[in-house]
């Protein structure tokens, strides 16, 4: 237990105590709204776009806001009196977004510096694109999952109260005024949403209007969920792997989970690690969904499921439904992850063996990691985007009908290329071909609607080469990337190719 306590309280001396004064520095707000920083190569900063306010920002507005914050009675006025308190009046959203964006930049500074120091200790700073590629997960799946037996499909629950996020951040930042300001944001959105829509969730308004700050707090919560998992994994592994998590300090983490661990460990932590001991355990997460795969038995996965449910209840003080964790065998289970429907089916085959005059058949079974495009959910996403109806029949897109012909073709072509690029790792291309067909015909219907013509007449007038790039763009890209391939491109196009330049999930795929 002493080893656990020391692990969870690691690097407490690095906690940040004085962040609140930075809120009154004008350059912080300029930094929060400078979208050019991302182009200069900084991968610690990902600008969050806030529609409708970027163009209105100026240094003069920041000065006025800072001046108002200096007033003693400014932040303590009643939130119910919108005439006296302009912070919750018609400028409420603008002012709160400016402060929250600045606050997000400030709290990220400490973690960015810590990440730099951890990379310098390893004497190797990887390139930013290697840190951010999400397609790099699938080659890992190809190498590992075919040798495993069980998988747990986990949906990480949201905390029921926003105060939990403040308490998690308190373990990293001991600047009391900053935490009070964060509570003020939550209190403001709670009261404002109750006045407008009493049944509206606090998460909805805050996450939509303050995306950067909300994502930072949610990521802090996810790191908290995974910290004890990383510790158990490092203690039970035969080969002590280096953890990729660099923000694992917890000031009061040990006291909160002590009661839960005593029940599990029976006052002897080392002797009970066999409950979770599995050298072939693999854990992958993206956003709020994670995959826990193991070569162990179904009983071991049930122990992990019970652990997660009790951990969320004891440490975060909320009950999570056990149905959020599904345990299945790889042989008869498919799971959604990053827009793909993945599985590890068993492929039986018979091999004829000849020995002298005798011949016999040997039955063999092989496992192969398969990834396909989930066509039904994908059609639903295309239907929401108004490219087709719910049955998958292409329709015109009226909102683009007022654009020029070149702009319409460019938008449809860009959408098609992005989806083709994202789903390049699909094992079967039939679903991808159907998506291309929907986008191609939707483009033709949109152009025909604009010119008040029929699709048949429009295509006949332009010829069969119309929109050919919808189907040939990927092969052109492959010919540039792999110019020395000796076999035909159409055969190469049927192979799975993972691109390591994809840094975020596709917008249409994100609807799945």
Curated annotation (Swiss-Prot):
Compartment(s): Plastid, Chloroplast
Native species: Amorphophallus titanum
Name of the protein described by the UniProt record: Maturase K
Similarity comment: Belongs to the intron maturase 2 family. MatK subfamily.
Keywords: Chloroplast, mRNA processing, Plastid, RNA-binding, tRNA processing
Disulfide bonds: none
Top-level taxon of the source organism: Eukaryota
Gene Ontology biological process terms, A to Z: mRNA processing; RNA splicing; tRNA processing
Chief location of this protein within or outside the cell: plastid
Keyword Plastid among UniProt keywords: yes
GO MF term set: RNA binding
Signal peptide region: none
Function field: Usually encoded in the trnK tRNA gene intron. Probably assists in splicing its own and other chloroplast group II introns.
InterPro entries from the UniProt entry: Domain_X, Maturase_MatK, Maturase_MatK_N
Any one GO cellular component localisation term in the record: chloroplast
């Amino acid at each position: 237990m002493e080893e656990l306590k020391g692990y969870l309280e690691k690097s407490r001396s690095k906690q940040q105590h004085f962040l609140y004064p930075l809120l009154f520095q004008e350059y912080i707000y300029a930094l929060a709204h400078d979208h050019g920083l991302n182009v200069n190569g900084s991968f610690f900063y990902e600008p969050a776009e806030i529609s409708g306010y970027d163009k209105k920002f100026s240094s003069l507005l920041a000065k006025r806001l800072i001046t108002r914050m200096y007033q003693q009675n400014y932040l303590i006025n009643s939130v119910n009196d919108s005439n006296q308190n302009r912070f919750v009046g018609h400028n409420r959203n603008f002012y709160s977004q400016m402060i929250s964006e600045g606050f997000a930049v400030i709290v990220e500074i400490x973690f960015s510096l810590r990440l730099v120091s951890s990379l310098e200790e390893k004497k190797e700073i990887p390139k930013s694109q290697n840190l951010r590629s999400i397609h790099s997960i699938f080659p890992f799946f190809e190498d590992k999952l075919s040798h495993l037996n069980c998988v747990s499909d986990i949906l990480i629950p949201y905390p029921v109260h926003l105060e939990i996020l403040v308490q998690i951040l308190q373990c990293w930042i001991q600047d009391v005024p900053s935490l009070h300001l964060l509570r003020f944001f939550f209190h403001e959105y709670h009261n404002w949403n109750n006045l407008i829509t009493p049944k509206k969730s606090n998460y909805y308004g805050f996450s939509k209007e303050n995306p950067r700050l909300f994502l930072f707090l949610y990521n802090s919560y996810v790191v908290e969920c995974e910290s004890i998992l990383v510790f158990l994994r490092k203690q039970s592994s035969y080969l002590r792997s280096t953890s990729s998590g660099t923000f694992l300090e917890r000031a009061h983490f040990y006291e909160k989970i002590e009661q839960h661990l005593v029940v599990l460990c029976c006052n002897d932590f080392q002797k009970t690690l066999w409950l979770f001991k599995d050298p072939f355990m693999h854990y992958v997460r993206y956003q709020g969904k994670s995959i826990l795969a193991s070569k162990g038995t179904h009983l071991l996965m049930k122990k992990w499921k019970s652990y997660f449910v009790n951990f969320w209840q004891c440490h975060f003080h909320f009950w999570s439904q056990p149905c959020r964790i599904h345990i299945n065998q790889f042989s008869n289970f498919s799971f959604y992850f990053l827009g793909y429907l993945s599985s590890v089916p068993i492929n039986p085959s018979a091999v004829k063996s000849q020995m002298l005059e005798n011949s016999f058949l040997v039955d063999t079974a092989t496992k192969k990691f398969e990834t396909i495009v989930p066509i039904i959910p994908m059609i639903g996403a295309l239907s929401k985007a108004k490219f087709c109806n719910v049955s998958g029949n292409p329709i015109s897109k009226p909102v683009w009908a007022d654009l020029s012909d070149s702009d319409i073709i460019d938008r449809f072509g860009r959408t098609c290329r992005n989806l083709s690029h994202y789903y390049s790792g699909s094992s079967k291309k039939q679903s991808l071909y159907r998506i291309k067909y929907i986008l191609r015909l939707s483009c033709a219907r949109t152009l025909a609607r604009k010119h008040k013509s029929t699709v048949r007449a429009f295509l006949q007038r332009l010829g069969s080469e119309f929109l050919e790039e919808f189907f040939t763009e990927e092969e052109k890209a492959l010919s540039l990337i792999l110019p020395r391939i000796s076999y035909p491109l159409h055969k190469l196009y049927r192979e799975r190719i993972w691109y390591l330049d994809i840094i975020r999930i596709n917008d249409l795929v994100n609807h799945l």
